[in-house]
UniProtKB/Swiss-Prot annotation:
Binding-site positions, Mn(2+) 2: 244, 255, 420
EC number annotated for this UniProt entry: 3.4.13.9
Family listed: Belongs to the peptidase M24B family. Bacterial-type prolidase subfamily.
Coiled coil region boundaries: none
GO cellular component term, pick one: cytosol
Key word Cytoplasm present: no
Protein name: Xaa-Pro dipeptidase
Gene it is expressed from: pepQ
Disulfide-bonded cysteines: none
Signal peptide: none
Pfam families: PepQ_N, Peptidase_M24
Length: 441
């Protein structure tokens, strides 16, 4: 069956966005939605810009990520307007003229200076819901970020359109290409920096393009959850490799983690295999009506069961969870929403009118507490780590007998394990976006 084109998918996506915007504006009492793309600004006491990052509310409408000082304007009943800043500039590369599958669906105006946008924005700024950062202020058009508008739009962003799913799949393909190159570099004995460069070259993206800083962790560095130091020399001996790295596709992110052992016959490889199999089962439980908080708790029990089997825990999974010992080995959340942002918004939202669903007690780093619904895309990223600071807390809290410390010492040189896929909640079985791409790569 032929796949729909991005142009047709975008047309449907735009209808969804305009319907959402109509409702959001009605709730907020505004007549126009105005979204600046964001602006560049200097670093403190310097004449160099901070790296530009596009406003996520802007790239939801159009697949443009490097167009500072541009604007999106939507008025109910009218086509979206894109005010596209294309300066006369011989110091920097100027954005190409708008092109692609989206241009026929919007009214596009080219401006040469930022203040030319004033003549194209709605006449009455006070009637506009302006979603952006303070630096985007232009004349009377000051971002006001009205809460009823944001609450509705951000809540609805959890439900991905077919167009968004198509772009998320492209982001998966790019990232997996990088992951394969990174694994090969690890097997060849490269340093963290060398592995990182191999990844970027394979994906075709650098630090300004990637959705987040690559985590390239060899040996004990795998115990640092967000390790981004990129050592220049490979450690000796080389034992393990944890990579958490994604890619960007037209403003949408992927977020994938894999862990490798240098010795395929080691106990660490066996532990990786056990966590990998458990992670796959966790992903299959992403179903409509399931509370993500419960998935997180179930992940704790599953991982502690593995540690018990490997002789690392001496108590039951339930006891490890109840006493907080499990959090020493699995100290982060099971995952989060993903889309325009790696940690996509409204993970705690109680409804499209606001409110908050709190995390379970004792689990302060879980980033998603909602009940799953069709269209949501979530990460499933269980992990097991050997972190001195957290293991010391186990001893201080009187639970040293819950752990076989000799087994812990044997695994500490490997740092930790994390496996992460992206999974779509559907009306039926879960759809894993990541595994099929690895299988085909």
């Amino acid at each position: 069956m032929p796949q729909p084109s991005l142009s047709s998918l975008y047309s449907d996506h735009l209808r969804t966005l305009t319907a959402r915007a109509d409702e959001a504006l009605q709730r907020g009492g505004f007549e126009h939605l105005v979204v600046p793309s964001g602006s560049t600004h200097y670093q403190l006491f310097d004449d160099r810009d901070y790296p530009y990052a596009v406003n996520p509310q802007f790239k939801a409408w159009v697949p443009l990520t490097r167009v500072p000082d541009s604007w999106l304007v939507y008025t109910p009943g009218k086509r979206p307007t894109v005010i596209f800043y294309q300066p006369f500039d011989y110091w920097h590369v100027v954005p190409d003229a708008p092109s692609g599958w989206w241009v026929d669906h919007c009214d596009i105006h080219i401006i040469r200076t930022p203040d030319q946008a004033l003549a194209l924005l709605p006449k009455h700024a006070e009637r506009c819901a302006i979603l952006g950062e303070p630096h985007s202020t232009l004349g009377a058009y000051v971002p006001n970020n009205p809460q009823p508008v944001l609450d509705y739009l951000e809540y609805q962003r959890a439900f991905k359109t077919p167009y968004e799913l198509a772009l998320l799949r492209i982001a998966q393909q790019l990232a997996v290409r990088g992951h394969r190159a990174a694994e090969a570099a690890f097997r060849a004995g490269q340093s963290e920096f060398g592995i990182h460069m191999a990844y970027c070259a394979a994906v075709g993206q650098d630090a300004n393009d990637l959705p987040y800083g690559n985590i390239i962790a060899l040996n004990e560095h795998g115990a640092v959850l967000h390790y981004t130091e990129l050592g220049q020399q490979p450690p000796q001996p080389l034992r393990s490799f944890l990579i958490d790295a994604g890619a960007s596709a037209y403003g949408y992110a992927s977020d994938i983690t894999r862990t490798y052992a240098a010795d395929p016959d080691s106990d660490f490889q066996a532990l990786i295999d056990a966590v990998d199999a458990a992670q796959l089962r966790m992903g299959q439980n992403v179903r409509a009506g399931v509370d993500y908080k419960q998935l997180h708790i179930d992940a704790h029990l599953a991982l502690m069961g593995i540690l018990k089997e490997f002789g690392i825990l001496t108590v039951s999974p339930e006891a490890a969870l109840a006493t907080g010992v499990s959090a020493a080995f699995f100290p982060h959340g099971l995952g989060h929403l993903i889309g325009l942002q790696v940690h996509d918004v409204a993970g705690f939202a109680a409804s499209d009118r606001g409110g908050r669903i709190e995390r379970p007690p004792g689990h302060p780093y879980l980033r998603l507490t909602r009940v799953l619904e069709p269209g949501m895309v979530v990460t499933i990223e269980p992990g097991v780590y050997f972190i001195d600071m957290l293991l010391d807390e186990v001893k201080k809290n009187g639970h040293a007998a819950s752990v076989d410390w000799q087994r812990v010492e044997a695994f500490k040189p490997y740092g930790g394990i994390r496996i992460e896929d992206e999974v779509v909640c559907t009306d039926g079985s879960a759809e894993n976006l990541t595994r099929p791409v690895f299988a085909a790569a």
